[in-house]
Amino acid sequence: MDLPGPIHDFLLVFLGSGLILGGLGVVLLPNPIYSAFSLGLVLVCTSLFYILSNSHFVAAAQLLIYVGAINVLIIFAVMFMNGSEYYKDFHLWTVGDGVTSMVCTSIFVSLITTIPDTSWYGIIWTTKSNQIVEQDLISNSQQIGIHLSTDFFLPFELISIILLVSLIGAITVARQ
């Protein structure tokens, strides 16, 4: 989106703070309904980021798939769960929470320090997308496919692994 600099910067800060607050709401709110609505806020802010970066197709796909389908499905599933079981024996902070937060913080710090210094193009299965075809000769959908299979191959695969683990966790919780 072609906006003047101060307006663009204000929108970036506003959407970034919406993402941070929504993410904290997803993790910290004890009521799963409120967490699901916070997840909806995060997904809407993400799609607005895509609109700011002139990726209208990806923004529309984000809204339709994640907000329109997956978040509604999560809210629907949470509505069927027994809400009173979340508040039984609710302790604000336990030893396991402290250990988990320390482990997550150390992993986060190590990733933040490692990822910017890593050259992902030295890995054998990634090539630069401009080596494949000229960018002017292909459509936006083809460019998205090329970027997913070249520049963003590793993050795309990591997201698929995270989704697989969350699906296995959901099946395990549903069986209990």
From Swiss-Prot:
<dbReference type="GO" id="GO:0009535">
    <property type="term" value="C:chloroplast thylakoid membrane"/>
</dbReference>
<dbReference type="InterPro" id="IPR050290">
    <property type="entry name" value="NAD(P)H-Q_Oxidoreduct_6"/>
</dbReference>
<comment type="subunit">
    <text>NDH is composed of at least 16 different subunits, 5 of which are encoded in the nucleus.</text>
</comment>
<keyword id="KW-0520">NAD</keyword>
<protein>
    <recommendedName>
        <fullName>NAD(P)H-quinone oxidoreductase subunit 6, chloroplastic</fullName>
        <ecNumber>7.1.1.-</ecNumber>
    </recommendedName>
</protein>
<dbReference type="Pfam" id="PF00499">
    <property type="entry name" value="Oxidored_q3"/>
</dbReference>
<dbReference type="GO" id="GO:0048038">
    <property type="term" value="F:quinone binding"/>
</dbReference>
<feature type="transmembrane region" description="Helical">
    <location>
        <begin position="152"/>
        <end position="172"/>
    </location>
</feature>
<comment type="function">
    <text>NDH shuttles electrons from NAD(P)H:plastoquinone, via FMN and iron-sulfur (Fe-S) centers, to quinones in the photosynthetic chain and possibly in a chloroplast respiratory chain. The immediate electron acceptor for the enzyme in this species is believed to be plastoquinone. Couples the redox reaction to proton translocation, and thus conserves the redox energy in a proton gradient.</text>
</comment>
<keyword id="KW-0813">Transport</keyword>
<feature type="transmembrane region" description="Helical">
    <location>
        <begin position="32"/>
        <end position="52"/>
    </location>
</feature>
<comment type="similarity">
    <text>Belongs to the complex I subunit 6 family.</text>
</comment>
<keyword id="KW-0618">Plastoquinone</keyword>
<keyword id="KW-1133">Transmembrane helix</keyword>
<keyword id="KW-1278">Translocase</keyword>
<keyword id="KW-0934">Plastid</keyword>
<dbReference type="InterPro" id="IPR042106">
    <property type="entry name" value="Nuo/plastoQ_OxRdtase_6_NuoJ"/>
</dbReference>
<keyword id="KW-0812">Transmembrane</keyword>
<feature type="transmembrane region" description="Helical">
    <location>
        <begin position="61"/>
        <end position="81"/>
    </location>
</feature>
<feature type="transmembrane region" description="Helical">
    <location>
        <begin position="10"/>
        <end position="30"/>
    </location>
</feature>
<keyword id="KW-0472">Membrane</keyword>
<dbReference type="InterPro" id="IPR001457">
    <property type="entry name" value="NADH_UbQ/plastoQ_OxRdtase_su6"/>
</dbReference>
<keyword id="KW-0521">NADP</keyword>
<keyword id="KW-0150">Chloroplast</keyword>
<feature type="transmembrane region" description="Helical">
    <location>
        <begin position="92"/>
        <end position="112"/>
    </location>
</feature>
<dbReference type="GO" id="GO:0008137">
    <property type="term" value="F:NADH dehydrogenase (ubiquinone) activity"/>
</dbReference>
<keyword id="KW-0793">Thylakoid</keyword>
<keyword id="KW-0874">Quinone</keyword>
